[in-house]
From Swiss-Prot:
One of its GO terms (cellular component) is cytoplasm. Pfam families: PRK. SUPFAM superfamilies: P-loop containing nucleoside triphosphate hydrolases (SSF52540). The lineage of its organism: Bacteria, Bacillati, Bacillota, Bacilli, Lactobacillales. InterPro entries: P-loop_NTPase, PanK, PRK/URK. This is Pantothenate kinase. Pathway: Cofactor biosynthesis; coenzyme A biosynthesis; CoA from (R)-pantothenate: step 1/5. Its EC number is 2.7.1.33. It comes from the Bacteria. It catalyses: (R)-pantothenate + ATP = (R)-4'-phosphopantothenate + ADP + H(+). Belongs to the prokaryotic pantothenate kinase family. It comes from Streptococcus pyogenes serotype M49 (strain NZ131).
Length: 306
């Protein structure tokens, strides 16, 4: 990797897995399968080798955050205010962010049984399709200008200050925000924020989403591998959409396989690859930790900020 990573320490998988004492995976194979995204691939060994050491590392950051908050309260002669520990997770479409986010949520819940661990995706902060159509932005969906960043930053500010906050809910089945549906958050102990844009800054040059994060992860992989995963996932979505005529993807479900692959490859190249190269990948050095995946979805290298 380039000088972009000069501030990171590279750790091999073999070295990383020694940073946690051998233990059970804290979840069953069935539970792991239930939280794994379409066409993603993760094993119990991955949980033990990669994610249990990661949980240990998050605990290190959490203790440091609590100690700093305590020291600040003493300095300012104020009562200590307990704040949620916020984890940001970013990476390309189809790289496996959702699997990682759900797995971390489950593992944190198991290792902190008395804590409330919540998960929110930034998809809910996309503008509704009708607004995007009116603004001529529907073909830019997923790009920075398609997100209501003011609403997202207000949400994070409320969370960080221990206030009850509400997030819109996005449905991939209808490819749109669900009208009048909100997800509520009441001062969780941990909040995982997952999305392609969590390290980006749009319009407001003085404030980044990452300013609210106590820990952050970027899921990385070669773009040619992500393209393959994206196409495989698209084909799996079409199979499911055949059973539901109301699904947004039902309109593509009857395409011959070759045409469906060609369509997905075109969307990847004209939308997702451009978004990755221009707006997502350039932000990865803002993460505290980079998890790099090989062609088989397995994490082979870890980069930890020095």
């Amino acid at each position: 990797m380039s000088n972009e990573f000069i501030t990171f320490e590279k750790i091999s998988r073999e070295s990383w897995k020694t940073l946690h004492q051998k233990a059970k995976a804290l979840l069953t194979q069935e539970e792991l399968k239930s939280i794994t995204s379409l066409n993603d691939n993760i094993s119990i060994n991955d949980v033990i080798d990669i994610y249990l050491p990661l949980i240990n590392l998050i605990q290190v950051y959490k203790i440091a955050q609590e100690n700093l908050s305590f020291s600040k309260s003493l300095f300012l002669k104020k009562d200590i205010q307990l704040r949620p520990f916020i984890i940001g997770i970013s990476g390309s479409v189809a790289v496996g962010k959702s699997t990682t986010s759900r797995l971390l949520q489950l593992l944190l819940s198991r290792t902190h049984p008395n804590s409330q661990v919540e998960l929110v995706t930034t998809d809910g902060f996309l503008y509704p399709n009708q607004f995007l159509i009116e603004q001529g932005l529907l073909n830019r969906k997923g790009f920075p200008e398609s997100y209501n960043m003011e609403l997202l930053l207000d949400f994070l500010d409320s969370i960080k200050n221990g206030q009850t906050a509400f997030a819109p809910v996005y449905s991939h089945d209808i490819y749109d925000i669900i009208p009048n549906k909100k997800q509520s958050f009441n001062n969780p102990d941990f909040l995982i924020v997952e999305g392609i844009n969590v390290f980006q800054n749009q319009q407001n040059n003085r404030l980044y989403m990452s300013d609210y994060f106590d820990f952050s992860i970027y899921i990385d992989a070669d773009s040619s591998h992500i393209e393959t995963w994206y196409i495989e996932r698209f084909l799996s979505i079409l199979k499911l959409a055949k059973r539901d005529p109301h699904n947004y993807y039902a309109q593509y479900a009857q395409l011959p396989r070759s045409e469906a692959i060609a369509f997905a490859r075109n969307v990847w190249k004209t939308v997702n690859l451009e978004n990755l190269e221009k707006f997502i990948e350039p932000t990865r050095n803002r993460a505290e930790l980079i998890l790099h995946k090989s062609a088989d979805h397995k994490i082979d290298e870890i980069y930890l900020k020095k």
